[in-house]
Amino acid sequence: DGKVYGIPVSVEGYGLVYNKEIFKDAGIDASTLTSYDAIDAAFANLQEQIDSGKLKDKYPQLEAVEEYAAKETWIPGLHTLNAPLACEYKNANELGASDDLGLKYADSLKALLDLETKYTTSKDDLSKLNAVDYSTEIGGGLAIERVAVVQQGNWIGPELKGIDETVANKMGMLPLPIKGAKEDCIPVGISIKWCINSQSDEKVKEASKQFINWLFQSDEGKKIVVDDFGCVPAFDNYDDVEISDPLSKEVKRYIDEGKTTPWVMDGFPSGFEAKSAADFQGYFSGEYTFDEMVEHLKADFKDLKK
């Protein structure tokens, strides 16, 4: 009928992934961190303890609260920017139908960037963040307990487990707080879908349908989706399968509590990710002021919508 359909692979969510054990050893009750100010105060407290050497005996490599991989275009250009926009637009279709970016919560975006950068080792020279990539943030940061917090999602669980399962099991997820809007939520969405090529041979299409049904609906397939893939199921008939991945459990908790915002970034025009990331990187490098960065973001969005 001219429409494209897909089966969602999983539900994914991202926020401030944190090392629960480090926070506990610092005397910080993470369950109270449900607002911007509370998270900011906790990060300041933890950074002070790191700088004083109080945690050095147990965590000899711990040098900063956070790392932020600004080199990866999808981190600032999609995920960070999505957070304030998800408080402004109901869904990706609404943003996609707009000729203007909007960015009603620009001040909240500034506050979020401050929160995510002022507790990094690059706090005195944010241009250094533009050289930080995913592997530095995860494998060379969170996984070796060099830092305690990163902006990431439950998709990093399997990688962390492969590096150090003990550390992987310490992970939790704090909200990605949009000050003055939604401060206790995480963005949740579907990033990947299974599709069947309509031009394939009929036997291939039928076999593909059987495989997808088996993977997502059989007892064996469900366990693979949850345990091996580390996914949060996108279907409601998984009550008999317990999620084992710590970060996926956290995403499910936010969903169950109704503490989620949408992935409106799926409504960005083609080519916007690279441009928006360059705008963020220009801000970090000092090429733009924050207000100039916002104007660049709006202009890039508008140009691509023409």
Language-model features, listed with the residues they occupy:
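Glycine-centered hinge/linker elements that transmit conformational signals in sensory
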Residues: F43-A44, L95-A131
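Paired acidic/hydrophobic, glycine-rich loop segments that form the ligand-binding mouth/hinge
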Residues: A148-G153, G172
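Extracytoplasmic/periplasmic solute-binding protein
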Residues: K3-V9, Y14, D40-S98, V147
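Short helix-initiation/N-cap motifs at beta->coil->alpha
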Residues: T34-D40, K128-A143
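Long, aromatic- and glycine/proline-rich binding clefts that accommodate carbohydrate-like moieties
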Residues: L174-L176, V225-A277, Q281-G282, K306
